[in-house]
Amino acid sequence: MESMEIKQELKRTWGPFFSRFGCFTQIQEITIPHILNKENVVVISPAATGKTEAVIAPIIENLLKGELKGLKVLYITPTRALVNDLFRRLEEPITSLNLTIGRKTGDHPVIEKKHLPNVLLTTPESFDSLLSREPMIFMNLFAVVLDEIHLLDNTPRGDQLRILLNRLRKILQKINSNLQYCALSATIDDLKIGDRYFDNSKVCFLKSPREIEYILIPAKNFIKEIFKIAQVRQIKKILAFFNARSFAESFSQKFRIPPFEDRVFVHHASLPRSKREEVEKFMNQSDRAILLATSTLELGIDIGDVDAIILYRPPYNISSLLQRIGRGNRRTDKLFAIGVYANNWEKILFETFFDCARIGELYEKRYQASLSVIPQQIYSYLYQRRRIGTTLKSIYQIFQSLYPEAIIKDVFKKLLSEGIIKEMRPGIYYLTDKIENKIAYGKIHSNIAEKSFGEYDVYEISSGVLIGRIFYLLEKFILGGKCWQKVQVLEKEKKVYARCIGEGPEFSKIFEGKGAGNYNYLLSTILKNRFFPTLLPEEIPFFYDGKNTHIFHLFGSLYGFIIAESLFEEGIDATDIEGKILMLQNFQMPDDRFPIPKLTSIKKVIANNIARFEDALGSGAFFYDLPNELQIEDHILNLDIPGFLEFIGCLKLREIDARDFTGTLRLISVEKKD
């Protein structure tokens, strides 16, 4: 369908949604005809390409041809901030068509049943609450839109949404409702993502046409360097991302120098809503400002055009990097970012992430349904059926296509034995008052759990100087090339005070600093190639010093810890060094196969570290409502242990001279002098 023909088809909605732009974007031209044809679509396109209008305008165009009574369009987006931002953007065009728009979030908890909006913006948690408390308001529904689906998918919240859609379909099946579904995403590795949420999805895919330009600078005096770059490039508006809100807050004062002074702001989830919205509004209207933010602004919140993106330290994965840099330079075909690295390892991570982002290789973890959602959805569904109760068969149906019945039954039996569920009549079950507080405060509708990714900041006990960061806290550990012994742990603050007890292995000194370690294990092959470009993808370098074996794996801290601890369970004195090197003490490899621990050993390590992994993996608010064996299984699935074991089973060890090994690593990790 040509652009002019699309415009003619949008008789009512062209003016309100597109006239101020004058033309359609490429993704809009691809998508709109399919939605007008009432197909289910997945729209994959970079930030700021007009995905929202590409979906909502043709849905409303079709909607205006029929009955407009009641709630017609359910628009689900990951956060309250996005709901508020979308409301600001969509209120005027929608109301100009004599339709109504509303929002349902924790900030806006009430909607009038007698005056339902035609379009409702909400979050998965508020959708859960509405479905449990007022299911009949959805009886006239016409379309469902899932916004920023990549931020939910492959998480407990994404699986919660899948089950909620099953429950919605279960309600509507009596009236043979034929809902239209649309999902939107800025970055996706898996083009079949839509199939998890609805049937017959048509993918409308636009690869990033925007060139990525970046500059990497060391953290020392980085603010001074950034201001130099800003002056040369005439940069006026900057968005800086930090991996922790404490960094964003602490650096805000240091940025308050000419020409920005009082135009430096901070934005993160802990700020009051009114303050966040005030900052967003100022950034949108200002022609010169700096905003220091956390991952909350990875989302499509409107803060106007930004000239440059600063990334202070590498983000957790490539998808996050793409989201962040996509917030800048919206009026040009080029993305410009400045990466600030604390050490050479972080510089290598930055280079690798940017290279992968340029070719669209995201290395996301393989999809696995989260088991911790099962108890949450049992509670929510039983609350929906609180007046008449429900059967176990009906509960199986809402989990259709996600979990085997045997697993659901195991969870159900645990909740029954603990008195959270009771059988009032033969085969008819109800919730008891054991979780009445969670019901009263709406907690049964949320899978969001506090998480810190399992990281601890490590401080030297006598000086209080920050040494670095580790993922898993052992009694003794290696960090920054030295051996440390734990002295004091402040669990709430995720701080560890430690005492140096000696030098670490010689080669570990090159890995000083706070490298990130929560990336997918598949990325290790790409990272290794930067150090040893002549090795085959399946080859892993190692050397034997006559006593110990040192294997350079780069799997990251999560998997490095699992391998070392599991081998230790099997009698091998194994140590992981910062997720990069596996040291086998007093051990020589018998052949060229990578040392693979048994699955039983891995399960034992996970069982002994349930809480640490739960914190690191963000396993969901109801994780501990699972039976113990399913807690272990949930971690196994979340970590994709079967895939990981298959991956390392294909690796071959390649012996390298110790001097070449350490020399190569030092050469790469030390900055070259001009």
Residue ranges and their predicted role:
Residues E538-E570:
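Short Lys/Arg-enriched alpha/beta "domain-start" segment
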Residues S3-K7, K11, G15-K281, R288, ...:
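Conserved P-loop/Walker A NTP-binding site and adjacent catalytic elements of P-loop NTPases
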